Amino acid sequence: MVEIKKICCIGAGYVGGPTCSVIAHMCPEIRVTVVDVNEARINAWNSPTLPIYEPGLKEVVESCRGKNLFFSTNIDDAIREADLVFISVNTPTKTYGMGKGRAADLKYIEACARRIVQNSNGYKIVTEKSTVPVRAAESIRRIFDANTKPNLNLQVLSNPEFLAEGTAIKDLKNPDRVLIGGDETPEGQKAVRALCAVYEHWVPKEKILTTNTWSSELSKLAANAFLAQRISSINSISALCEATGADVEEVATAIGMDQRIGNKFLKASVGFGGSCFQKDVLNLVYLCEALNLPEVARYWQQVIDMNDYQRRRFASRIIDSLFNTVTDKKIAILGFAFKKDTGDTRESSSIYISKYLMDEGAHLHIYDPKVPREQIVVDLSHPGVSADDQVSRLVTISKDPYEACDGAHALVICTEWDMFKELDYERIHKKMLKPAFIFDGRRVLDGLHSELQTIGFQIETIGKKVSSKRIPYTPGEIPKFSLQDPPNKKPKV
């Protein structure tokens, strides 16, 4: 049996960094090297201030960094020395050419494959960690076969990650399952068993699933599509609840107690974000269209359409509640990350809500406890979001929630940070213009509505009528836009 003693991971991002840190932590006899072309990112991994925020990550890294966990820009040497190479690079949605806006861009995967074969001799296991379309492993193998050399034996596996940002370390230490896909040949199965042995250091054998390569690749896309579908489904019900007087939380509890349905991912909100859900669902849509399955493609496209609708609907509600105009009005945006306990802003609903309000001339004062000012500016300066001067003219980054809300017409909660439940809302109300509005896009203030109304707030929340005198709104009038639109200008910083 092949014994893995040295691991190289290409890509030091949200997947590669935490995953390999946990592997090093759980397998002290294995030397793990995480490499990246981004020198600043590697320097951050080697510093006290890690490049990403994730609860528990710092403690894991510090327990083994410099012992059996290393971060480096020396990619070629790390590949040459490794028994196993993880490919954990970005697979963004294409912004140009065929499949624009839906297909995955595999240029970084291809670059990794070419670099691996160039720097490899003998036997090596190459493992997809990035989310890729079905049969991406076949493309990697074709590159290997076309560049083979004497005694070179590269085995390709699929080992998708199922971690969630904000709970990544917990998910990695105690996964629901580990999925490993490989060729159904003796050589392929030998590679599968070798990778299984790494995870068996801490994962029970019954939680390690082995499949063929294509099933493993599709399982990752399907899992994210199903989770996104759940969110869009409950968000569609939230619109119905607001129209009828029902409470979406009560409806979610009622249906979630049905064991056939379950209660996870039934939290209505302003919409899902993050690097995976939209990208992977669109990739699935494109795959279905390419395979001449238009009905299946349209089905999954509706998951994205509902998410877009929920964001536009929420923004319309803000505008209409503020007497049908937000022009020159100060609005506090609390939360910019796509979810709590992470600093990741990719596809964050806060970007979309900010875009809609900026287009109406609102002055936004934004606060997030983990997203740096520079990242907010870059995100809002994306070509699909703002005009050249909009960010500098309409956006202020606040140092705390109280500063953001001072003199505001409304505060809008876009991220479910726990700290937003503990704010001194009497203090905030005194400093806001009246009537003072709260738009709770994450329902973090459930249970506080009576108290907040007593203070004097007008409250609007997802999936429930709270304020007794609410101005009717007409959802869907805001035009769509996408962060996947091809750039025609450079972002400002």
From Swiss-Prot:
Region (Disordered): 88-110, 466-493
Phosphothreonine: modified positions: T474
Region listing for Important for formation of active hexamer structure, in residue ranges: 321-325
Reaction(s) this enzyme catalyzes, per UniProt: UDP-alpha-D-glucose + 2 NAD(+) + H2O = UDP-alpha-D-glucuronate + 2 NADH + 3 H(+)
Residue sites binding NAD(+) per the record: 11-16, 36, 41, 89-93, 130-132, 165, 276-279, 346
Entry similarity comment: Belongs to the UDP-glucose/GDP-mannose dehydrogenase family.
Record text on subunit structure and interactions: Homohexamer.
Written domain comment of the UniProt record: The protein goes through several conformation states during the reaction cycle, giving rise to hysteresis. In the initial state, the ligand-free protein is in an inactive conformation (E*). Substrate binding triggers a change to the active conformation (E). UDP-xylose binding triggers the transition to a distinct, inhibited conformation. The presence of an intrinsically disordered C-terminus promotes a more dynamic protein structure and favors a conformation with high affinity for UPD-xylose. The allosteric switch region moves by about 5 Angstroms when UDP-xylose is bound, and occupies part of the UDP-glucose binding site. At the same time it promotes domain movements that disrupt the active hexameric ring structure and lead to the formation of a horseshoe-shaped, inactive hexamer.
Listed name of the protein: UDP-glucose 6-dehydrogenase
Originating species: Mus musculus (Mouse)
Gene behind this protein: Ugdh
